[in-house]
């Protein structure tokens, strides 16, 4: 294959600007898939992606195209647009030479557009803008061109103006890919094999399937390969490409993107970002992998049926293989038994993982309230990291507590600036700056505690801006904060799964809200149940669930009043004994309903 005619590129954009639709049109126009097999969101293979209309997983496909009597091979990598899946984007960019930047002609440059551009620049990629949805009545092409030129600094004089939905000017995109996307640099089939794993998944028949970009060398069936991070060796059983179905080939060569299997049954042997080389003729040093991403949000996942715990462990091992950003460890709870504590990149990431476990592995789950990673400095000089409120030390042992802050960039039309500023202040945000995108749109920058935006901030932002604002955030470090742990007590017993950490400014409101909700969610028992919220030994909120009353006088038809008094006293004593030894039954759905109501 002529290396000069290979083009490796990905498509990046803000969520809902038309990446997957453009991918569909490129697949269609190059006749990679027959018209009969063609469907919308072809590369979004997960049912969940189709339902939500978003891309969650990156996906690679090979397209063949002929222009001016030359045969071209395109490797297109479709990427997610949501801020939670930035890690997926960075992985796909490492396997490319260029990125098509799709911008919606009705919305212009959004917060996540800029974030993805910076990722592409970090990877030294050629950025090629494409303006989509030009057929819509509200499209303002000239304004969007100016935005791209001023905010990103790319000349837009010959930018393709397309409609991915109708197929308008899609052939211009193919021309610009041939003209502007560089062919693979220094790709040599005769050098030692050097291939980057940018994605993987587990197949029950083939074992681990690795998606790779070959930078140097050749890879064929029967080769002995070495995974450089773990120093483990395997014999290649199959290599091939996706177009978009898996298609096996005799070999893959430098510059190509494809897949490799080697009957790998040990899931832990494969790491996304690792380098594969030939075991008998290895390369000098591995490729620069990916920077390890840090989890932003932590939450406990527990099976509704404790018998499903082993199945949950298997499910977590397989999902981690396809989602390198997910972290987890096993934990136990007094109230819920065995489960896993997971670290996620954001709330959407958390929601997607939970839904995947329920759908793909048929394990109904209880999701506990999300938390962030706090730092505790103790009086004895120790430093502790706490992502689970139940593990927070006693208050008298804590010298100071730090919480993570994020830099929040909100892109919005002018008329919503006031409501957004008020919203950010209510969530403990600190105003930093206001910059202009154009005459009618601004970018507001705030520094805000991460714990404040992981609950309902995004929904409230959409509400006050009628859905017109977009946001992007990045972690900027830890700051000293006045935080306390709130324990929830039922009948005097702490329920570890309900503990939470709050800033002292909001602790009374939050405690009161949860206690009132629990009163409505927990069914009445034969004895009175006090529900208390406590900070240390101080009770800051209380509600009581009244006892169910059995009418012990029903069988007394008249008769002596002392007989009735005796029966009532016996009932009173029985209830005292029940209260002392009886346990409160918390329905499983209470935990998820508490979380839903918070949102």
UniProtKB/Swiss-Prot annotation:
One of its GO terms (cellular component) is plasma membrane. It is an enzyme of class 3 (hydrolase). SUPFAM superfamilies: EF-G C-terminal domain-like (SSF54980), P-loop containing nucleoside triphosphate hydrolases (SSF52540), Translation proteins (SSF50447). PROSITE patterns: G_TR_1, G_TR_2. GO terms for biological process: positive regulation of translation. Keywords: Cell membrane, GTP-binding, Hydrolase, Membrane, Nucleotide-binding, Protein biosynthesis. It catalyses: GTP + H2O = GDP + phosphate + H(+). Residues 4-185 form the tr-type G domain. It is a peripheral membrane protein. Its EC number is 3.6.5.n1. It is found in: Cell membrane. GTP binds at residues 16-21, 132-135. InterPro entries: EF-4 (IPR006297), EFG_III/V (IPR035647), EFG_V-like (IPR000640), EFTu-like_2 (IPR004161), G_TR_CS (IPR031157), LepA_C_sf (IPR038363), LepA_CTD (IPR013842), LepA_IV (IPR035654). GO terms for molecular function: GTP binding; GTPase activity; ribosome binding; translation elongation factor activity. NCBIfam families: lepA (TIGR01393), small_GTP (TIGR00231). PANTHER family: TRANSLATION FACTOR GUF1 HOMOLOG, CHLOROPLASTIC, TRANSLATION FACTOR GUF1-RELATED. Required for accurate and efficient protein synthesis under certain stress conditions. May act as a fidelity factor of the translation reaction, by catalyzing a one-codon backward translocation of tRNAs on improperly translocated ribosomes. Back-translocation proceeds from a post-translocation (POST) complex to a pre-translocation (PRE) complex, thus giving elongation factor G a second chance to translocate the tRNAs correctly. Binds to ribosomes in a GTP-dependent manner. Belongs to the TRAFAC class translation factor GTPase superfamily. Classic translation factor GTPase family. LepA subfamily. This is Elongation factor 4.
